[in-house]
Amino acid sequence: MELSQMSELMGLSVLLGLLALMATAAVARGWLRAGEERSGRPACQKANGFPPDKSSGSKKQKQYQRIRKEKPQQHNFTHRLLAAALKSHSGNISCMDFSSNGKYLATCADDRTIRIWSTKDFLQREHRSMRANVELDHATLVRFSPDCRAFIVWLANGDTLRVFKMTKREDGGYTFTATPEDFPKKHKAPVIDIGIANTGKFIMTASSDTTVLIWSLKGQVLSTINTNQMNNTHAAVSPCGRFVASCGFTPDVKVWEVCFGKKGEFQEVVRAFELKGHSAAVHSFAFSNDSRRMASVSKDGTWKLWDTDVEYKKKQDPYLLKTGRFEEAAGAAPCRLALSPNAQVLALASGSSIHLYNTRRGEKEECFERVHGECIANLSFDITGRFLASCGDRAVRLFHNTPGHRAMVEEMQGHLKRASNESTRQRLQQQLTQAQETLKSLGALKK
């Protein structure tokens, strides 16, 4: 046989062999498919030890194969001084505000809702809330109007201010209606704070650059303030409604007065005074309820309490009353600060923990660790000073203000020693006994 004929025969043999292998593989694949159809599971899963599924039908097969998306677990926290946890939001809460009449707490979250909670339910098992929906957006900041008949929010995507009116229904609930038009867009950087003067004369918005805007209630910009602080970290309207303050990269807090005429017309914004004494950037500040005290917290590791009841027009500067130290959590967001209405207690939030200080002695009295699953976004005392509220995940947590009750005991004991009038002594003794009984019920009465 010639060499060429032998080569042709060998090639034919190889071709036939390949065809045979392909046929065998096809038969094997068909057998595997048949096995999968009979069992309802892939054959490889049988080999790995999964029991055969005796159920039939494509619906159950799809349910088995569908990957379920697990919801993030709610952070659990317990403490003997925890008064309540408000948990109706399905998204992270970024801001909250107590109404001036003390009846409500407003919260906003990235779940496109604002919740209005009844404060009288705080110590009940059930915590009722009313819901206002934010169409096609969500609110990052919320503030009640002075008359508690409306609230304003800052829209995350719209970058503007929206007003919601609250209309009371016959059943005692409220209907929430957004005004037809939002405020015009004016800020060029993200807005970090908003506020309304309790006089009802102006609204304040502050962005993370150096801009603070003063608005009329109708959405007209009355004044633009350049804080010259490199960047703003916090801004607020004083409870008295006269002042606007800001802090930022510089080691001071700047305060302006928003001036109006006798007929209520806007006149000007003038520099009032500054809080000077920190050696590094100021994270945050807060006013007491009467605006006569302010507190500040800085990157330098200190907090300070100030007497701001001064005649600034006569060039009188605020007085430093107390300086305290704190340890800032490593890698945490800038500290949040809240001052009790009577300025006797200062609360600092660093990371997910809260520290409470007696401002007269400068001593830390309480510490709540890992309160939220994320860094605390907002911190606030209610207007009575009974509770401290915090938010940082999908819940608001409310704490009994035991340092406030202890400060009340110390104050009443001091007044009793100096009181000469019997009726005054009886009134002071009644307040002292009430504060002591509250501490005793909370297991926080010091012997």
From Swiss-Prot:
Keyword flag Protein biosynthesis: no
One Gene Ontology term from the biological process aspect of the record: cellular response to hypoxia
Xref: InterPro entries: G-protein_beta_WD-40_rep, WBSCR13, WD40/YVTN_repeat-like_dom_sf, WD40_repeat_dom_sf, WD40_rpt
Organism taxonomic ancestry: Eukaryota, Metazoa, Chordata, Craniata, Vertebrata
Each WD repeat, start to end: 88-127, 134-174, 186-226, 228-267, 277-316, 329-367, 371-409
Modified residues (Phosphothreonine): 433
Organism: Homo sapiens
Positions with biased composition (Basic residues): 57-69
Protein name per UniProt: Transducin beta-like protein 2
